[in-house]
């Protein structure tokens, strides 16, 4: 877990790096980079999409292998945004529609999705935490001002503070499932019908008093006011706010029921990284500080999507086609890492792959998804023109 480089960028000689990218011959080790002797140079085409955004298409016909790269410089007038496919869970749409709905310049698929339309790992968009998950999440994140990126194993924490008394309510989960005795859990509008407040519980509804704000030294704060505190057999509606719930007949229930309408509360969540408003999960980490991370060495070649960060802070979004003989064989995790290193990445995270691997540029699907069509995905990483309107 670490901050990665400010986004005052230096140019990367991507043309030189690309001469190595797809020279992974069939006989090479999965983790090797560099050119195969006698191999012809790959075909590389670069197109400027907007200031700070380039699209690179790399073809190696002999292997065969095709890679698609978005090179992103966030010091320019563009924004990296993470988003679920819909307004709330469950969330599933085709990437081309997600890109169009957000007016994005380009986008790739993000975190793997659960079958019910949720992300596997924790996820955040525009300062709102989607949900908590296991303690060993591996994530990529960007600060609200786009000046810093982060990649690693974050320390996710969520709490709600009574601003009048100073009492802190630590959340055991967020938008996941009903509370067990002794637990306090939270549900926001993003949870939708997939993660809704529980029945047979004691709950407090909090109504927002402002937008999410960057917290010091890290994380996000958002202020709320108590609307109602009650115990009921029926779920308490969120009504545009958040609901904090616990099991009835517990000390936690007594504390929540003591909150009176109008009491100001502050929701705080953090990954342990300063200023983060957007974050996406993946698995596994491929590179950290230029050092190869442990990966599956026996995993087969597949379509892949990954995010990388160069030593100068530029972001690389990479999609590799696979499962298409004669077009592109895909890549092992070791080959994916080698490609990212050849592109200049010092930090990299594998995102969702297989039939979900996809890139859209200027409204067009530029790769060939292995399903032969666009798959409905739960979330995406987008590049927006100008500032993010959601923030």
Predicted regions span which residues?
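Bacterial N-terminal signal peptides that target proteins for export
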Residues: 2-14
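Gly/Ser/Thr/Pro-rich low-complexity, intrinsically disordered segments
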Residues: 9, 22, 28-391
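Bacterial N-terminal signal peptides
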Residues: 13-23
């Amino acid at each position: 877990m670490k901050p990665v480089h400010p986004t005052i960028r230096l140019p990367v000689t991507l043309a030189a790096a690309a001469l190595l990218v797809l020279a992974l011959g069939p006989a090479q080790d999965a983790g090797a980079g560099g050119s195969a002797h006698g191999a012809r140079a790959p075909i590389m085409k670069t197109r400027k999409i907007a200031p700070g955004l380039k699209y690179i298409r790399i073809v190696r016909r002999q292997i065969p292998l095709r890679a698609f790269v978005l090179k992103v410089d966030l010091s320019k007038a563009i924004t990296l945004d993470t988003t679920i496919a819909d307004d709330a869970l469950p969330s599933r749409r085709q990437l081309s529609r997600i890109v169009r709905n957000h007016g994005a310049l380009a986008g790739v698929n993000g975190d793997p999705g659960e079958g019910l339309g949720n992300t596997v790992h924790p996820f955040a968009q525009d300062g709102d935490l989607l949900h908590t998950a296991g303690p060993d999440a591996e994530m990529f994140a960007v600060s609200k001002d786009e000046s810093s990126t982060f990649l690693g194993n974050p320390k996710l924490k969520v709490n709600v503070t009574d601003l009048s008394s100073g009492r802190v309510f630590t959340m055991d989960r967020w938008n996941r499932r009903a509370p067990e005795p002794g637990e306090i859990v939270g549900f926001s509008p993003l949870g939708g019908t997939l993660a809704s407040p529980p029945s047979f519980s004691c709950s407090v509804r909090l109504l927002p008093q402002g937008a999410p704000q960057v917290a010091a030294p890290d994380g996000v704060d958002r202020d709320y006011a108590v609307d109602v505190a009650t115990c009921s057999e029926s779920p308490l509606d969120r009504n545009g706010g958040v609901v904090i719930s616990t099991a009835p007949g517990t000390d936690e229930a007594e504390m929540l029921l003591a909150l009176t309408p109008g009491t100001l509360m502050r929701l705080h969540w953090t990954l342990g990284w300063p200023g983060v408003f957007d974050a996406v999960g993946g698995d596994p980490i491929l590179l950290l500080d230029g050092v190869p991370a442990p990966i599956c060495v026996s995993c087969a070649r597949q379509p892949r999507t990954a995010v990388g960060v160069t030593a100068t802070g530029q972001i690389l979004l990479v999609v590799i086609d696979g499962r298409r003989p004669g077009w592109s064989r895909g890549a092992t995790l070791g080959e994916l890492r080698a490609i990212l290193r050849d592109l200049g990445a010092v930090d990299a995270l594998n995102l969702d792959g297989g039939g979900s691997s996809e890139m859209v540029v200027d409204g067009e699907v530029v790769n060939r998804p292995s399903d032969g069509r666009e798959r409905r995905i739960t979330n995406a990483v987008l590049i927006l023109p100008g500032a993010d309107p959601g923030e």
